[in-house]
Amino acid sequence: LAQPTWWMGQKKPYKWQVGISWNAVDDDGRDVCQPFDVKQSWNYPLFPSRIMVDRYLKKGLSLEFAGAYNNYTTDKLVNDTTGLSGLFISTDLNTKFSFYQLFYPMKWFDPYVSLGLGLTHRDAYSQTVTGNLNINVGFNFWIYRNWGLQLQTSGKLGINGQFFNTNADYMQHSLGVVYKFTESRSHGSSNRKKYKWTKSRQKYRGGKKGKG
């Protein structure tokens, strides 16, 4: 089967991606039993609170750094308990794989998965700083040129002295805007213009010399 040219390494779909989004944290301690209990379990600020930078490598692989801010409120469940509040900050480094090539030439749909490691600070948790193993699933919807919408769900497994600590597990969801920087083509076109200008200049000089 024929593959897209960028998949074969001739052209990259982008060089960098940046994004800003809203994030919601589900830390109710119920694993995935009630993943969409927004009213009782989801903590989310009203303003965009997550940033992302993605560097494309090759063959659908990229490296992503993300940071997020949130705030726990006393009316939400935290490890099956209410009355807890405090600051939440997460930082993550993930390796991402895009399935964009499977849907080519449908350029607007870009699903991906990613794995990585992170650190999470939670005032509401007994051990304020924990490590986590990230398992992420997301979608980019390219709606206008290099602009798109990104939807992502992350399962974060807490890493503690006991390696995996279920009390430190949580889910994080995000929805926001992304922009991709593609490789510039101006260098080649400028060279062609320079070549044409030099060639015409040589002709002009030659004609002038002949008249003398």
Residue locations for each model-derived region?
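Short glycine/proline- and aromatic-enriched beta-strand/turn motifs that initiate or cap beta-hairpins
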Residues: A2-D54
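Short loop/turn motifs that connect adjacent beta-strands in outer-membrane beta-barrel proteins
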Residues: P4-K15, K59-G60, Y100-D110, I143-N146, ...
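Predominantly the C-terminal beta-signal and adjacent terminal strand-loop region
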Residues: W6-W7, W142-G212
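Residues that define the transmembrane beta-barrel architecture of outer-membrane proteins
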Residues: Y14, N43-S49, S85-T91, F109, ...
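Transmembrane beta-strands of outer-membrane beta-barrel proteins
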Residues: W16-I20, L63-F65, T91, F109-L115, ...
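Residues on the lipid-exposed face of transmembrane beta-strands in outer-membrane beta-barrel proteins
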Residues: I20-W22, I51-R55, L93-F99, L115-L119, ...
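Outer-membrane beta-barrel translocator domains and adjoining extracellular loop/strand segments
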Residues: R30-D37, D75-T82, D123-G131, G161-A168
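Gram-negative (and chloroplast) outer-membrane scaffold detector with strong preference
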Residues: R55-T130
